[in-house]
Amino acid sequence: MDHFKQLEVWFVIGSQHLYGPETLRQVKENAEKVVTGLNQQANLPVKLVLKPLVKTPDEILALCRDANYQDNCIGLLTWLHTFSPAKMWIGGLSILSKPLLQFHTQFNAEVPWDTMDMDFMNLNQTAHGGREFGFIGARMRQAHQVVVGHWQDKNAHARIGKWMRVAAAIQESKQLKVARFGDNMREVAVTEGDKVGAQIQFGYSVSAWGLGDLTAVVDAVSKGDINALVDEYEASYQLTDAVKLNGANRQNLLDAAQIELGMKRFLEQGGYHAFTTDFENLYGLKQLPGLAVQRLMQQGYGFGGEGDWKTAALLRIMKVMASGLSGGTSFMEDYTYNFQNGNDLVVGSHMLEVCPTIAKEQKPILDAQYLGIGGKADPARLIFSTPAGPSLNASVIDMGDRFRMLVNLVDTIEQPHPLPKLPVARAIWKAQPSLDVAAEAWILAGGAHHTVFSQALDLEHMRLYAEMQNIELLVIDNETRLHEFKDALRWNEVYYKLCSR
């Protein structure tokens, strides 16, 4: 998935006519060098495009209006090279609907002690020009991010890159369509929620489809297409004897391929990039979609089990955010615990639907085995473990008056023992700061049993996302202390009731 190829971030320099044409010429020349240098050397995921210098309120308003209407523009990066009186920005910022990053930098890294004169001081005023811009952002309660550092500094590059990834994810969220095949698992609470409220908050829409609509597309898949996809399976995975040619469950594999092709065509035809299924709504399907869901997630689709549309949307959004990074991102569920003094572990999995982007094995096992849930034929699935490394679990829940995101940092470990009788993909981790604290905090905060598990993204990505979406964020990591966490829950309740808008 390369979601960033056609996207742009507009690099905007603010100044004013006060300084005269020569100073403005130098500002433009320096800006061109900075943008060229960042595009060539900073390893940014999205291309920077230098826009004409803005010097008046009308120019700023026109630029912000253009940014709103350009689909490939995902945000503005501003640099106050000189002093740009911030009242000029009120009109533009009032209508800006794209993410905004203020890059508090300057062209020169060091002060030229021997040669610095007032001309130099006039030209290089970021130190106070940036503060003026920051004031109007704060005064307008304008949600924006700030990166401070020289434009050739690698730490600044990394932070800008993360902001770009999240800005691209925000753009995806605004246009995302989620398809629900069937309904939510009956009597489950956390997978419910306000879909209208979610569309207002995040931008994505959620549409329900009956199983008959899906099965009509599945049934229309040709045998030739099924056989071609099975050939791909045989080249990509280790097939068990049961699903090899003439194996006892070979037909189950063919049925799984048909479901995958039908689901993908349905999603493509409707412009959907995330979807849900429910084992209680399988009318017309021969098996619970397992392999199909795994492979569609690998191709970038978001997914949520049991009708969990919030997790499906979050998975798609995080996959866009993580595009091109090492490590995978998957639908996940805390399934069972290993309570052992000094070695408390969580086994994460699901009935079938874990994304192969987090697989340790180059060729996962492909099998079809019994699954009592759903009451259908033995479903095909990929079986694998997950490599060790820093990871996170994220969940978005509907609190009635707001959306809350929880993030728990975890340390994934190599599978400590064989699991010869467990026919599903899995990840095994140590929760931060400990299993008892992490689980208690998660439960107190109402975190869902479904999560998005990622070894590609880190906490800063998720903080930025929560800030840009203006939603509550609760973090559980090695710094978490339960009494402080409980205090934060109480304070947040008051804050969001007083400050909701």
From Swiss-Prot:
Pathway: Carbohydrate degradation; L-arabinose degradation via L-ribulose; D-xylulose 5-phosphate from L-arabinose (bacterial route): step 1/3. Pfam families: AraA_central, AraA_N, Arabinose_Iso_C. GO terms for cellular component: cytosol. Binds 1 Mn(2+) ion per subunit. Gene3D superfamilies: 3.40.50.10940. The keyword Manganese applies. It is an enzyme of class 5 (isomerase). Mn(2+) binds at E306, E333, H350, H450. Its EC number is 5.3.1.4. Keywords: Arabinose catabolism, Carbohydrate metabolism, Isomerase, Manganese, Metal-binding. The keyword Metal-binding applies. Catalyzes the conversion of L-arabinose to L-ribulose. Belongs to the arabinose isomerase family. HAMAP family: Arabinose_Isome. NCBIfam families: PRK02929.1 (NF002795). This is L-arabinose isomerase. It comes from Pectobacterium carotovorum subsp. carotovorum (strain PC1). The lineage of its organism: Bacteria, Pseudomonadati, Pseudomonadota, Gammaproteobacteria, Enterobacterales.
